[in-house]
Amino acid sequence: MAKEAASSPLEDLDLSGEEVQRLTSAFQDPEFRRMFSEYAEELTDPENRRRYEEEITALERERGVEVRFVHPEPGHVLRTSLDGTRRCFVNVCSNALVGAPSSQPGSGSAVSGRQWSLPYSLAPGREYAWGRGTRYTVYDVVFHPDAIALARRHERFRQMLDATALEAVEKQFGVKLDRRNAKTLKIKYKGTPDAAVLRTPLPGGAPARPEGEPESPFPDFPYPYRYPAAGASAAVPRPQAPSPPEAVRQPAPTEPRYSVVQRHHVDLQDYRCSRDSAPGTVPQELVVTIELPLLRSAEQAALEVTGKLLCLDSRKPDYRLRLSLPYPVDDSRGKAQFNKARRQLVVTLPVAPTASRPEPAASPEEAADPPGTDGAACASACRGEAGPAGVCAGDAISGPSRTRAADAGITTPDAPGKERVAKSEERDFGGQEISTTGTREEPPSGAGNSPGDRGGGALSTSWGDLDAGLSVGSASVRPTLGVEARETREGTGREPAYRAMGGPGTDRGEALCPPLQCSQDEESLTLLVQVPWILLQSLQGEVNPLWYKLSFSTQDLVYYSFFLQFTPENKLSTKEPEVSISSNNAVINLAKSPECHGYWREWYYGLNNYCLEERLFVNEDNVNEFLEEVLSPPFKQTLPLTPPLIEVLQVTDSKIEIHAKLQECSNSEQLHEKEERVHEGSPLTEKENTEHATISTTDSASSVAVTVLEADRCGSATCLQQGALDVSQKLFAESQQPKSEKEREFIKDKSAVYANERKDNLKEPVITEEKELDGNHPSSLLNKTAVRDTPGFDHIKETNMQDGSVQIIKDHVTHCSFSFQNNLLYDLD
């Protein structure tokens, strides 16, 4: 079976080899060519066409059907596309046999107007071929000549006529035409005119057979159409009631048809019987074929490829395509080619190689966690890695791993050894776990930092005593919340709380938690979202009596989201919040429920309800609770302290500034005991002699200057507690200092030089310190060792191994470079 080339007009002819040979030899005969030409002229002769129509009309009347041939008269031509694959032309023609247009005043509308009825006649589509082998389709829509005349005078009537013609073709033949890019051509008719047929039944029906005529032995001639019913002539079709007029909407740009083909380069090595031979699942190239039947050249279109998105825009004709590609491509090596014959744009895009991310090997500093340098990161919980109890876990962070910690949104110290991230400790509260994260100062080498070292009380000494203090947080009241308590210190690369909760250090595709400040009055809450350039149309909020959720985006296409939650006794009103947006921030006003008016104590904030952080309002109750923590020491004292004088200087949302001054305490009893021992003849130790030498230049009252607790912006309860513990330890250490400096009466000659050196070191006229909890400087308290009288160990028994005599030593002081963790270790000296 022979076929021509694909571009040949004869590609659809199904001819055998014998038929092709016979046609070839016949057209070589001049006589056959003359007869074939006469046959073609007879078919196109108008007179023969008229005689054909008369015979068809007479034959149809014998069956009781009236046939009328509708010859289209040229009007104007619309060019569009058919199903997005080929060109299509619609001839808007006229004929007097079609009903005339009519109109009536519009009803049921506030705008006065008229409703038009436009009868039309349709002819089946005809296919034609271009000289290059491409095909197009032509449809004829015939109206009354009056409708064409009105369309020539009124532009809006012409638009309505064209829209009616396109809609009629789509509904009748089930095709899709491109209305957006329909264009009126200058020609009046496209293709060869072909008459349509109007068939209507005669009023009297089919004529009866004559009485004397015998019946034909042959069956009736097969007829392609059913004869209309007898009662059909009586039922005159009435036009349907016109639908109410709708606002004419400009159609959107047309989305062209496209196909995406994944192309692989076949290599026989990938099909060997071996484990390492397997064809890759990722293709080498993506071939995108876009059908643009109305596009003449590639200059009329703009193509842009970025990553996994292909964008195509064209004005005339109006095309718009936004195609999401299955794989990221390398747009720098892509190529596009426009096929004018098929009106196709073929885009070939190489697939970008996937960049594998090797996991960084754990360094020895990271593998072996030194004491006091363990870190805890709560950012993983904000990304959904926390369990049902909201437990936050993190890896250890050291100096070499600062880059990885910055990517995870974890605060790292600027100077090593000044500030370290404390290890997260998980404690059991009623079957639930919470995670507390804080920072602490690392003591210098040689200073004791053990829990028993009272003189150098670092933060590690208070972690074991926080069981009662943590009840202030949300663990005991709200066991399902993951509490993250932080101490943010100035000057050490301060990181906002939202960075650890999914801030700019997180992945690009995830939502970020914005910085937020919350203030209150008795009837409402005011939220200040410190994010610039917020898009108003992107705000999506939801209000519940116990929580409030909001998500939005900025002009930089950064997505933010946060979640607020309150305790069951504090409820919000469900009315719509008031939102005010400026170029720098956004202010949201939430109303409190009428039965919950007043000042609230706490609120919970985070990226979602699985990672919430407790924050406290600045009110009188919270300040009083903080002052109580300052006054109460973290451990039991051996000697009663005179209550210090507390003066609150400043209370703000981010800072609490107080002045604590110790009152004068009399050491007459201690001095009296020393005097008695000296007069009795008991020798004084070298330490006591030194202390006595310095007592004359030391005032009996010590004061702690202004202590500023720079709380985290979140105002978490654990931050306040940790600051209270530091102040308490500091007050206790200062109260013990005058006790260690007691009077002396004599000094031995052999230790004069050593005593003078100790005297210079221990001489402190007025101990005045000013410290902020910022982690920049090592605590001066860690460099001091307070010598105290230990009850129950006022003497030591020493046995002589030679004669077995026992010597009782009442005053015994040992100098060492380390600190004992337990007082019982004195017996081993």
From Swiss-Prot:
Record's signal peptide: none
Residues recorded as bearing Phosphoserine in the entry: S450, S632
Residue stretches of biased makeup (Low complexity): 352-371
Main localization, broad class: cytoplasm
UniProt-listed GO biological process terms: axonemal dynein complex assembly; cilium-dependent cell motility; epithelial cilium movement involved in extracellular fluid movement; establishment of left/right asymmetry; establishment of localization in cell; in utero embryonic development; inner dynein arm assembly; outer dynein arm assembly
Pfam families documented for this protein: PIH1, PIH1_CS
Gene Ontology cellular component terms for the protein in this record: ciliary basal body; cytoplasm; cytosol; dynein axonemal particle; extracellular region; Golgi apparatus; nucleolus; nucleoplasm
Keywords per UniProt: Cytoplasm, Phosphoprotein
Purpose: Required for cytoplasmic pre-assembly of axonemal dyneins, thereby playing a central role in motility in cilia and flagella. Involved in pre-assembly of dynein arm complexes in the cytoplasm before intraflagellar transport loads them for the ciliary compartment.
Assembly with partners or alone: Interacts with CFAP300. Interacts with DNAI2 and HSPA1A. Interacts with DNAAF4. Interacts with DNAAF6/PIH1D3.
PANTHER family documented for this protein: PIH1 DOMAIN-CONTAINING PROTEIN 1, PROTEIN KINTOUN
Entry protein name: Protein kintoun
Origin species: Bos taurus
